[in-house]
């Protein structure tokens, strides 16, 4: 059985380089505005990058997990099978300004597998719309991953350009009862999602999560500069998520 871990949504709200490896899987939105590319670095650490009209929006940002009581699962990966498909259908919402919503996206599914003896693997699935994208992790059943405890994610969002951020702090005693801060992105602390950003050239971004089923919620911690990393909500015991 495949287990859906999380769907992360990056929404591009406004209208406002380097050479790429030809072998890296990539996918574009139906109108070609947004594009996503998957890569691994020299240490085999997987990453993704997002461009809009050919300009970087998210610079290469890490993907993956930190497990508890298991060998490390963060490098020595190679890109395996990858598939694409296109969907254009509709769905009906029970309330809101529009009853029928068009669901039009291109999808890229990439398998990332270890080169070592364990041969563990995971899938990352991107759905790219004209105005945003979402991605999720899936852990297929496999002998070396029958049961895992996820201590943290390695998922990152490295914002390409200087930006203003609207955010509220995460992990504080009063939880949701805060006014939004408006600061340069380099001054953001630990932040709840959604966090909204406006780049200096007018592009608006919002990073949030969706489709949480039996999984920890996500906040963001700023690692350095404009680079953020997922920070899972603590659970009971050592692991933040248990997969069986």
Tell what function each PLM region has.
Residues 19-23:
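Boundary at the C-terminal end of the N-terminal hydrophobic targeting segment
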Residues 6-16:
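Bacterial N-terminal signal peptides
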């Amino acid at each position: 059985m495949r287990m859906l871990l999380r769907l992360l949504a990056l929404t591009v709200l406004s209208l406002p380089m380097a050479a790429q490896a030809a072998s890296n899987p990539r996918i574009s939105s139906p109108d070609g505005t947004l594009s996503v590319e998957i890569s691994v670095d020299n240490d085999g650490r997987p990453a993704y990058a997002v461009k809009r009209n050919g300009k970087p929006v998210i610079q290469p940002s890490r993907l993956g997990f930190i497990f508890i009581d298991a060998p490390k699962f963060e490098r020595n990966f190679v890109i395996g099978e990858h598939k694409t498909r296109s969907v254009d259908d509709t769905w009906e919402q029970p309330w809101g300004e529009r009853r029928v919503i068009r669901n039009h996206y291109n999808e890229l599914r990439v398998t990332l597998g270890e080169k070592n003896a364990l041969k563990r693997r995971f899938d990352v699935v991107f759905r790219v719309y004209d105005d945003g994208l979402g991605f999720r992790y899936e852990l297929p059943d496999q002998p070396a991953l029958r049961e895992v405890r996820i201590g943290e994610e390695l998922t990152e969002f490295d914002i390409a350009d200087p930006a203003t951020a609207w955010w509220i702090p995460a992990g504080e005693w009063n939880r949701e009862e805060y006014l939004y801060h408006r600061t340069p992105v380099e001054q953001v602390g630990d932040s709840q999602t959604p966090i909204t950003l406006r780049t200096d050239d007018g592009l608006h971004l919002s990073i949030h999560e969706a489709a949480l089923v039996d999984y920890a919620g996500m906040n963001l911690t700023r690692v350095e500069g404009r680079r953020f990393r997922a920070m899972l909500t603590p659970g009971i015991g050592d692991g933040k998520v248990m997969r069986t």
